[in-house]
Structure formats: structure tokens, C-alpha cells
Amino acid sequence: IERMDVPREYAIQATIFSEAPGGCSTGTSAAVTVALIGALDRLTPGRLSPHEVAYTAHAVEVEMLEQQSGIQDQLCSAYGGINFIEMFEYPYASVSQLHVPNSIWWELERRLALIYLGKSHVSSQVHEKVIAELEDEGPETPRLEALRGTAEASRDAVYAGDFTALGQTMVENTEAQGRLHPDLISEDARQVIEIARSYGALGWKVNGAGGEGGSLTLLCPAQSYVKRQMLQAIEDESSLFQNIPI
């Protein structure tokens, strides 16, 4: 409200709800901030573009709350859908929306699963660890190049509707995260990955900054009954593990 400079004559009551637990590594804080800024923008003279909404939300987290934050969560929330984001100079980025046939949309919805590991985390702490580890290597370090490559490969796989390639890219991304810092792949995440692997999952990705708690995204096998068995096995493994509907 302070950032948007809402006229003082307005009394504001905001109600916030999300299916995703807080600290779930799914960009919930960015999504909430984007939604509030979009709503408050209706009360102010200007009309912000999606890009402007995203950068205002980013400023709230970085400048006002003094948190470490990328810009991708805010951009995804502001634009919606599937996006390919190129960050050419932090925090500046361009957004290309991926338009795919309904058949690919529906298959993604059917195959993807979100597993909450039962503990929230503060991603800023993990960001600080990674920054400290990499600051002497520079932006062109091979460890970062590996992550950049998976973004392009996953974009191409989605366009092609190639779920095997998409799953492999998710696995490569997770392995590249682990090479950035060992703390990014927790023991709980490794447990879930092993169960998913045993059921023939095509891919798995530690979400967000990784570390303790948070969540994983799984790309499930084609057979729905195998997906159900896999999710049940994951939830049976620990009372902390929870399948979040998406």
C-alpha cells in the first residue's frame, strides 16, 4: 500500500489465500505481491503493464523488505502461462510467452505433480550461500552455464511436446543446482527423487532456491495409475511429504 501510494481517502481490507504453503519454493510471496499491486493499481490514476507490476513487486521484496530475490517469480505471476525469461542484466529481463496447443497444456497438467517437503524455508538465506560461493568465479562460470542451458532446452521440449526431453532437462537442472552448492539438494528431496525414479518418473526438479524444506516438481509417467501409486508411496514415506494439487 505504501509503495503504490494509494489515495488516503480509501480504506482497504485485503484477504489472501493460497493452496500452496508459505515457503514452498513456488513463488508464493511474489504471486501475492503481484496480485495486491494489480488490485491496488485499479485505485490509482495510472494503469501498470504486466512488466511494471512485476518490477514494482520486485522492488517491494528487495528495496523495502531487503530480501535477496530474482525477478522470474514476479514476471511469471504478472504474465501468467508458460514463459521463457532472458535476464540480460539483473534485474532487467525480457519475457517471451510460449503458446502451445491445448493437447500439450492438458498433458502437462496431467503429468506434473508438486510435492511439498513439509518445511518452509527462507530462500534469501540460500541465495546468500550461493552468491558467496560463486562471487569469485564470475557470471560465466561453467556451473551457471549449465543452468542457463537447461532453460533453453526445456523451452524447446515444451514447444515440441517432447516429455522425455523435458524430464531429462529437469533432472539436469537439479544436478546443476547441486553443483552450485551441496545444500541446495536436501536429504528429503533426495528421498522423494529416489521414489519417483523407482516408479519411472521422467523428471524431477528442486523448486526455487532449493535447500531444506520447499518442494519438488515431478514429471510423472504416462500411466495415471502409476502416478497415483507413486504419489501414495511418497506420502507414505514421511508424514511431512504432501502432494499439492496443481
What are the functions of these language-model segments?
Residues 11, 21, 110-112, 213-215:
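Short, solvent-exposed beta-strand edge segments and adjacent coil->beta transition regions
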Residues 1-6, 43, 55-68, 74-205, ...:
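C-terminal nucleotide
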Residues 1-56, 189, 196-198:
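Anion-binding (especially nucleotide phosphate/pyrophosphate-binding) glycine-rich loop
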Residues 19-35, 68-83, 205, 209-213:
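FAD-binding core of FAD-dependent oxidoreductases
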